[in-house]
């Protein structure tokens, strides 16, 4: 019986006839926790293995993406333990500034009919912390239900007191070194969340828009017009010029002339700019410096007036004119077009497909907006580029290294301030007698502020004479410190740099690149050696799974129906490295019935097969203790054959682990155990029992 005896002898408790995954999984997870099986000991002399969890949003819930990501991390952590390493898998959650504040504000509106400004900052933050305490542990409990072998005693939160201190130290460090400054720039603005966003927080979506062709009369040439094409007629009240390409012969004689802006009626210059595309529309551009990034640059180069006609919430303000003031931007688009039509200045409207930037969190079109914000000049750019190109840090799949390199070589200063209340408040204080002057300054840094600005972890001693900056830091400004700010010095000395990072390619710029730069800046070392980018999970139609589409099942329902092991194993079997995952759901005609998930059902069947095989062995006699294999001559041909296949499997799996080919590992294990071990070996030796 050889191999089978060795495997089954590990079991001494009677195995029940029916496999009930919920009971089994809850029992063993409880035993693991009681035995501190996942505890990481920094004083251990064993070889270290460290991995930090990408912290999910504190008020989030488990998704299939979390299942995939954390199953891979669990495989890596358990594999390292099996190899005799001291393992730290560090868990935690992110405070998720915009996402959490939006949920709290929605709750306040629904339950009390109030907004955050009705409560005031201090009272609102009390409610936010109450919300976090009530809902913040849900996803941690769900990850435990999934069976994740983290060191749960080390759970961290990005707004823990100690972690917050590290974030403040980071800001002070960069301000004192001249890398943080405050400036008036055009930023991405979310009219829903009322905050600035970084470029990485904006996602481009294809939209079916309209292209409006309108006429601006040329000053001094009555009856002659310039025809202009635009997707945004609602901002024409902020036009301060009309621009053409200097090489466009159609308009060469008009450069230096003026045209009439339709309303409020005003003469605006016709200028030349080489960035104008003669092929777009009519080759004539309305220049609105306050509401377009390209126009803003044109405005700076030509000293144009900046006329902001939008309020922060996306409604039009008084500069747009009384008839449009207070009107939503999209409603105003139609009204402005109608007025142009009434004036005989609307030529035609065409269907037009273009890409529009949306706030990733609020899912609304963003607005380019000129605003005073805090910015960071990124540190350690060259070292961070070299670490990946020289493969000191390995990206898997390797193609993501090119994406990373391209972004790093074209990197822009990071807008780190957010107009929120939930988050790490910027540790900057303005002297009261100069606060208004400093906050309106076009540029502000360590050199220009002098002693009128206090930047520090603690407020100034005479705090009553100072006003703290209202803004908070971008959530990613705290999470880019995650690999080392989560560890005390003893733990860091043992487990940092970490071995692996498992994450999605969608946050390669938000998080991965920034962690690499922060690692070199604050520790002088890389934060991790390997980055494994997971696949995107899609439905059988190829659509990305999301709550809004209603095509994403609740993993907890799947766990209840099939078991956590079944779900984890099935996800790994369908998740090839470097390509998207197709997750199949078969809808039942009877809505009262539970839907069918054939891939997860295969996972459950496999777990059931393991259970029955173990039970079959237990029924044959004693399973106490692990016994050594007998001599070769005492083994049957069936034993020898299965041992040979097992040796071959071990070699193949070792190669697959080294290459992070988790789908390959799952399928090899499935094929070996189901076909070779159960269907062939067990059936062959049954007569010998």
Question: What is each PLM-predicted segment?
Answer:
Residues 2-247, 271, 288-301, 305-320, ...:
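N-terminal, positively charged nucleic-acid-binding surface of large information/translation enzymes
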Residues 16-17, 98, 106, 348-362, ...:
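Long, charged, mostly alpha-helical binding arms that flank functional sites
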Residues 45-53, 75, 111-115, 140-147, ...:
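Active-site-adjacent bridging/hinge elements
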Residues 65-77, 93-94, 163-166, 225-341, ...:
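Structured ligand/cofactor/substrate-binding pocket environments in proteins
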Residues 197-225, 414, 443-473, 481, ...:
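Flexible, glycine/threonine-enriched loop-and-boundary segments that flank and lead into catalytic domains
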């Amino acid at each position: 019986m050889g191999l089978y005896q060795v495997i089954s002898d590990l079991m001494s408790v009677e195995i029940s006839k029916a496999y009930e995954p919920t009971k089994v999984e809850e029992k063993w997870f409880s035993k693991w926790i009681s035995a501190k099986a996942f505890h990481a000991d920094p004083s251990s002399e064993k070889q270290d293995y460290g991995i930090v969890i990408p912290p999910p949003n504190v008020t989030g819930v488990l998704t299939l993406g979390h299942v995939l990501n954390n199953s891979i991390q669990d495989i890596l952590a358990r594999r390292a333990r099996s190899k005799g390493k001291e393992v730290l898998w560090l868990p935690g959650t992110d405070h998720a500034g915009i996402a959490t504040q939006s949920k709290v504000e929605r709750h306040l509106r629904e339950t009390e009919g109030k907004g955050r400004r009705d409560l005031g900052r201090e009272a609102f933050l009390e409610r936010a912390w109450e919300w976090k305490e009530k809902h913040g542990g849900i996803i941690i409990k769900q990850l435990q239900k999934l069976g994740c072998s983290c060191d749960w005693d080390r759970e961290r939160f990005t707004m823990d007191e100690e972690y917050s201190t590290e974030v403040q130290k980071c800001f002070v460090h960069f301000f004192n070194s001249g890398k943080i400054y405050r400036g008036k720039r055009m930023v991405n603005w979310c009219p829903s969340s009322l905050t600035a966003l970084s470029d990485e927080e904006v996602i481009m979506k294809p939209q079916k828009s309209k292209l409006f062709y309108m006429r601006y009369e040329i000053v001094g040439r009555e009856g002659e017009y310039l025809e202009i094409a635009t997707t945004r007629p609602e901002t024409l009240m902020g036009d301060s010029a009309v621009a053409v390409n200097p090489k466009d012969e159609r308009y060469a004689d008009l450069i230096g002339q003026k045209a009439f802006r339709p309303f409020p009626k005003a003469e605006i210059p016709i200028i030349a700019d080489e960035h104008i595309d003669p092929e777009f529309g009519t080759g004539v551009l309305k220049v609105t410096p306050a509401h377009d990034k390209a126009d803003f640059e044109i405005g700076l180069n030509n000293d144009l007036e900046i006329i902001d006609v939008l309020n922060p919430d996306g409604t039009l303000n008084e500069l747009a004119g009384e008839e449009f003031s207070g009107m939503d931007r999209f409603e105003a688009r139609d009204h402005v077009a109608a007025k142009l039509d009434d004036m005989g200045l609307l030529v035609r409207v065409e269907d037009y497909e273009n890409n529009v930037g949306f706030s990733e969190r609020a899912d609304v079109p963003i607005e380019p907006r000129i605003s005073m914000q805090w910015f960071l000049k990124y540190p350690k750019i060259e070292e961070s580029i070299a670490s990946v190109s020289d493969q000191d840090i390995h990206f898997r799949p390797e193609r993501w290294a090119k994406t990373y390199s391209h972004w790093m070589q074209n990197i822009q200063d990071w807008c780190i301030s957010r107009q929120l209340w939930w988050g790490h408040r910027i540790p900057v204080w303005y002297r009261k007698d100069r606060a208004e002057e400093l906050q309106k300054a076009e540029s502000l840094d360590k050199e220009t502020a002098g002693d009128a600005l206090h930047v520090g972890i603690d407020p100034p001693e005479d705090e009553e004479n100072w006003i703290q900056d209202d803004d908070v830091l971008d959530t990613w400004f705290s999470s880019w410190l995650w690999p080392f700010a989560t560890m005390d010095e003893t733990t860091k000395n043992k487990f940092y740099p970490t071995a692996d990072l498992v994450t999605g390619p969608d946050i390669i710029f938000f998080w991965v690149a920034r962690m690499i730069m922060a690692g070199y800046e604050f520790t002088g070392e890389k934060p991790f050696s390997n980055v494994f980018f997971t696949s995107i999970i899609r439905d059988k139609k190829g659509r990305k799974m999301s709550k809004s589409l209603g095509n994403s099942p609740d993993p907890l329902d799947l766990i209840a129906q099939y078991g956590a092991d079944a779900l984890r194993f099935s996800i790994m079997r369908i998740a090839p490295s470097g390509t998207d995952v197709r997750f199949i759901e078969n809808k039942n005609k009877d809505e009262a019935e539970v839907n069918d998930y054939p891939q997860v059902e295969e996972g459950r069947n496999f777990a059931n097969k393991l259970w029955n095989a173990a039970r079959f062995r237990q029924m044959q006699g004693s399973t106490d203790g692990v016994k050594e294999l007998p001599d070769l001559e005492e083994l049957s041909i069936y034993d020898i054959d299965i041992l040979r296949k097992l040796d071959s499997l071990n070699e193949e799996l070792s190669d697959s682990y080294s290459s992070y080919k988790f789908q390959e590992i799952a399928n090899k294990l499935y094929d070996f155990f189901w076909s070779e071990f159960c269907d062939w070996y067990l059936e062959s030796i049954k007569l010998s029992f």
